[in-house]
């Protein structure tokens, strides 16, 4: 097990995130393991509340996600620092995560609850036209559903799972214990007295090979209603943390936080759009721009977005605003179990510290972002009608 301790006095809370990383074969069926992990994590949450009080477990979270040929399962909690809660024994709580115990069997009710939770999560992702369109664009560009909608999960496999499969959970426990486990802790923690820990960890990685740079797919859910168009831009090779910061700031300047350069561009062109969402997908290394508009304007949108990106500009005031939004978002993410896990992966990937990222944000100039945006390349679009 790897233990990563990120000491900081910046927060009045402590975030703890445990994760399990498992390579899977393309034909593997991780759904059963996900059901077991959801139930086991719910069991751990109750154990923590019983042992350490409601405040230690009320913000407990868990998730299981597929990333290409790997499955990442996460559980964790965020709690008020012990200096504000004298009854909390932090060392014992951290040890509980380090020595996580798993139930030897699951009740039918626990299995059905986990199934329902997972199915609802999948349905929400497929129903959200922005998430769906972005996933379809990625899988077409990379020629593999594992880069897109397959990451959402497979409803038919989950629905077919029977509770009897979990009456004896020995094989699930053995499998979990054999996976690469890491424990990430952020906060003002003096020490992490967990024997046998190592500091070196592995990150979720994948080989990216674009097989199609001329994607244009259209799917019709309904003849009525608006359309959602998602345009993708390949961001090339991320050489260091500076490149990561630049693309995040470009994302913010284009429209991630609401003060949207794209909305302004559409207004100037007298083209009404309902919604604009931009986001940088770090797993696929794509900048995604999603526009919700009337079906009548579908064909007008892509050239306008390309024009806005190719003529991208930003002044000092706009850049400073984007920087502050990005700092706030980053610190908010760090102060949560899932966000902590994600950013620990970024710190490892670029061999930097949290302070390096914050300093790097301050150092970026308008010229830097203007130069960087010229290196990204349009790969295509996906349209969902209705």
From Swiss-Prot:
GO terms for molecular function: metal ion binding. It comes from Bacillus subtilis. The gene is albE. Pfam families: Peptidase_M16_C (PF05193). The keyword Plastid does not apply. It comes from the Bacteria. The lineage of its organism: Bacteria, Bacillati, Bacillota, Bacilli, Bacillales. This is Antilisterial bacteriocin subtilosin biosynthesis protein AlbE. GO terms for biological process: bacteriocin biosynthetic process. Involved in the production of the bacteriocin subtilosin. Keywords: Antibiotic biosynthesis, Bacteriocin biosynthesis.
């Amino acid at each position: 097990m790897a233990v990563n301790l990120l000491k900081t006095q910046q927060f009045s809370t402590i975030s703890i995130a445990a994760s399990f990383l498992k390579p899977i074969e393309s034909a593997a069926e991780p759904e059963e393991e996900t059901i077991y992990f959801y139930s086991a994590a719910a069991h751990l949450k109750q154990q923590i509340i019983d042992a350490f009080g409601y405040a230690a477990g009320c913000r407990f979270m868990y998730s299981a996600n597929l990333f290409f040929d790997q499955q990442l399962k996460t559980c964790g909690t965020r709690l008020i620092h012990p200096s504000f809660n004298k009854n909390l024994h932090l060392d014992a709580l951290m040890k509980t995560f380090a020595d996580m115990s798993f139930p030897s069997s699951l009740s039918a009710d626990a299995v059905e609850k986990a199934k329902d939770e997972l199915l609802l999560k999948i349905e929400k992702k497929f129903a959200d036209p922005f998430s769906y369109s972005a996933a379809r664009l990625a899988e077409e560009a990379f020629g593999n559903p594992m880069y897109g909608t397959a990451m959402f999960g497979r409803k038919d496999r989950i629905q077919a799972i029977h509770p009897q499969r979990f009456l004896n959970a020995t094989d699930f426990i053995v499998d979990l214990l054999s996976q690469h486990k890491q424990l990430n802790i952020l906060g003002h923690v003096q020490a992490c007295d967990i024997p046998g820990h190592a500091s070196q960890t592995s990150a979720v990685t994948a080989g990216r090979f674009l097989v199609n740079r001329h994607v244009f797919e259209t799917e019709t859910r309904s003849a009525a209603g608006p359309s959602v168009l998602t345009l993708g831009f390949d961001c090339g090779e991320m050489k260091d943390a500076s490149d990561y910061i630049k693309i995040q700031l470009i994302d913010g300047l284009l429209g991630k936080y609401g003060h949207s350069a794209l909305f302004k561009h559409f207004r100037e062109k007298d083209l009404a759009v309902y919604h604009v969402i931009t986001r940088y997908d770090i797993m696929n290394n794509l900048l995604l721009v999603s526009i919700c508009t009337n079906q009548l304007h579908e064909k007008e949108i892509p050239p306008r977005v390309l024009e806005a990106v190719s003529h991208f500009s930003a002044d000092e005031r706009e850049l400073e605003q984007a920087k502050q939004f990005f700092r706030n978002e980053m610190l908010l993410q760090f102060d949560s179990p899932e966000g902590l896990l994600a950013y620990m992966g970024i710190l490892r990937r670029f061999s930097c510290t949290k302070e390096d990222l914050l300093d790097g944000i301050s150092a970026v100039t308008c010229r830097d972002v203007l130069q960087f945006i010229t290196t990204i390349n349009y790969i295509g679009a996906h349209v969902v009608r209705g």
